[in-house]
Amino acid sequence: MNIILLGPPGAGKGTQAKLISEKYSIPHISTGDIFRKNISNKTPLGMEAKSYMDKGQLVPDELTIEIVKDRLGEEDCKNGFLLDGFPRTVKQAEALDEFLQNKSSKTDAALLIDVPQELILERMTGRRVCGECGASYHIKFITPKTEGVCDLCGGKLVQRKDDTKETVLERLEVYSKQTQPLIEYYKNKNVLLALDGTKEKNEVFENISNVLGAIN
C-alpha cells in the first residue's frame, strides 16, 4: 500500500507514521531523513542538495523528486511505502504519480491528520526541554515534579526557538499555503482521507486502520 501522510506541524504525524509502518510492514520514509542520509553518504544527489542548503536556499523540486524516486526504488518499498514530508507541492505530487504509473502502481491513500490551530499552538508552545540532558516535558501534558526543573538531572527547562508562538504561527502559515493545493489535488483524485487528529493517539490510529482497511 502506497500512503502519503499530510498534516500540520504538531499533528502527531511521527507517532502515527511509526504505528502505520509497523502494522502494514512498509517503510516510513521521511524526506528529512533521506536528505540527511544522502548528504552523510556523500551521494551525487546529496552533494547537489547540500550545495543549495549551505546557501540557505530551498532544494529545487526536480532534485527533491530525484532523491525521493531513488529511495522508492529500493527493495523495501516493493510492497508499498509511507511518505512523510513529500510531496509538498502539486508539481511534486504529479511527478510522484507519474513515477508510480510507470511502475504500474499508484497512490492508494493520502491521509490528512487534521488538528485545529489552537490545539497545535497549545501542543507546541507548551513543550519544554532540559537544557542539560535533553529530556522532554510539556507544561500541561508532561509536567515535571518541580516547575521549570528537570526530574532526571535537576537542569533548567527551556523552550526551544522552534516552539515559540511566533515560529509556530510562521510554520503553520507556510504549511497552509503549501498544503491546501495538495489537499485539493488528492481530493480530486478521490484518495484523500481526512482524520480527526484531536483524539488520543490510539484512537487516531484505530480510525486510520479502519479507513485503510476499507480500501486495502
UniProtKB/Swiss-Prot annotation:
<feature type="binding site">
    <location>
        <position position="199"/>
    </location>
    <ligand>
        <name>ATP</name>
    </ligand>
</feature>
<keyword id="KW-0479">Metal-binding</keyword>
<feature type="binding site">
    <location>
        <position position="160"/>
    </location>
    <ligand>
        <name>AMP</name>
    </ligand>
</feature>
<keyword id="KW-0963">Cytoplasm</keyword>
<dbReference type="Pfam" id="PF05191">
    <property type="entry name" value="ADK_lid"/>
</dbReference>
<comment type="similarity">
    <text>Belongs to the adenylate kinase family.</text>
</comment>
<dbReference type="InterPro" id="IPR033690">
    <property type="entry name" value="Adenylat_kinase_CS"/>
</dbReference>
<keyword id="KW-0067">ATP-binding</keyword>
<feature type="region of interest" description="NMP">
    <location>
        <begin position="30"/>
        <end position="59"/>
    </location>
</feature>
<feature type="binding site">
    <location>
        <position position="171"/>
    </location>
    <ligand>
        <name>AMP</name>
    </ligand>
</feature>
<feature type="binding site">
    <location>
        <begin position="10"/>
        <end position="15"/>
    </location>
    <ligand>
        <name>ATP</name>
    </ligand>
</feature>
<dbReference type="InterPro" id="IPR006259">
    <property type="entry name" value="Adenyl_kin_sub"/>
</dbReference>
<feature type="binding site">
    <location>
        <position position="133"/>
    </location>
    <ligand>
        <name>Zn(2+)</name>
    </ligand>
</feature>
<protein>
    <recommendedName>
        <fullName>Adenylate kinase</fullName>
        <ecNumber>2.7.4.3</ecNumber>
    </recommendedName>
</protein>
<feature type="binding site">
    <location>
        <position position="130"/>
    </location>
    <ligand>
        <name>Zn(2+)</name>
    </ligand>
</feature>
<feature type="binding site">
    <location>
        <begin position="85"/>
        <end position="88"/>
    </location>
    <ligand>
        <name>AMP</name>
    </ligand>
</feature>
<dbReference type="GO" id="GO:0005737">
    <property type="term" value="C:cytoplasm"/>
</dbReference>
<dbReference type="InterPro" id="IPR027417">
    <property type="entry name" value="P-loop_NTPase"/>
</dbReference>
<dbReference type="InterPro" id="IPR007862">
    <property type="entry name" value="Adenylate_kinase_lid-dom"/>
</dbReference>
<feature type="binding site">
    <location>
        <position position="31"/>
    </location>
    <ligand>
        <name>AMP</name>
    </ligand>
</feature>
<keyword id="KW-0862">Zinc</keyword>
<comment type="subunit">
    <text>Monomer.</text>
</comment>
<feature type="binding site">
    <location>
        <begin position="136"/>
        <end position="137"/>
    </location>
    <ligand>
        <name>ATP</name>
    </ligand>
</feature>
<dbReference type="Pfam" id="PF00406">
    <property type="entry name" value="ADK"/>
</dbReference>
<feature type="binding site">
    <location>
        <begin position="57"/>
        <end position="59"/>
    </location>
    <ligand>
        <name>AMP</name>
    </ligand>
</feature>
<feature type="binding site">
    <location>
        <position position="127"/>
    </location>
    <ligand>
        <name>ATP</name>
    </ligand>
</feature>
<keyword id="KW-0808">Transferase</keyword>
<keyword id="KW-0418">Kinase</keyword>
<dbReference type="GO" id="GO:0004017">
    <property type="term" value="F:adenylate kinase activity"/>
</dbReference>
<comment type="pathway">
    <text>Purine metabolism; AMP biosynthesis via salvage pathway; AMP from ADP: step 1/1.</text>
</comment>
<feature type="binding site">
    <location>
        <position position="36"/>
    </location>
    <ligand>
        <name>AMP</name>
    </ligand>
</feature>
<dbReference type="GO" id="GO:0005524">
    <property type="term" value="F:ATP binding"/>
</dbReference>
<feature type="region of interest" description="LID">
    <location>
        <begin position="126"/>
        <end position="163"/>
    </location>
</feature>
<keyword id="KW-0545">Nucleotide biosynthesis</keyword>
<dbReference type="InterPro" id="IPR000850">
    <property type="entry name" value="Adenylat/UMP-CMP_kin"/>
</dbReference>
<comment type="function">
    <text>Catalyzes the reversible transfer of the terminal phosphate group between ATP and AMP. Plays an important role in cellular energy homeostasis and in adenine nucleotide metabolism.</text>
</comment>
<keyword id="KW-0547">Nucleotide-binding</keyword>
<feature type="binding site">
    <location>
        <position position="92"/>
    </location>
    <ligand>
        <name>AMP</name>
    </ligand>
</feature>
<feature type="binding site">
    <location>
        <position position="150"/>
    </location>
    <ligand>
        <name>Zn(2+)</name>
    </ligand>
</feature>
<feature type="binding site">
    <location>
        <position position="153"/>
    </location>
    <ligand>
        <name>Zn(2+)</name>
    </ligand>
</feature>
<dbReference type="GO" id="GO:0008270">
    <property type="term" value="F:zinc ion binding"/>
</dbReference>
<dbReference type="GO" id="GO:0044209">
    <property type="term" value="P:AMP salvage"/>
</dbReference>
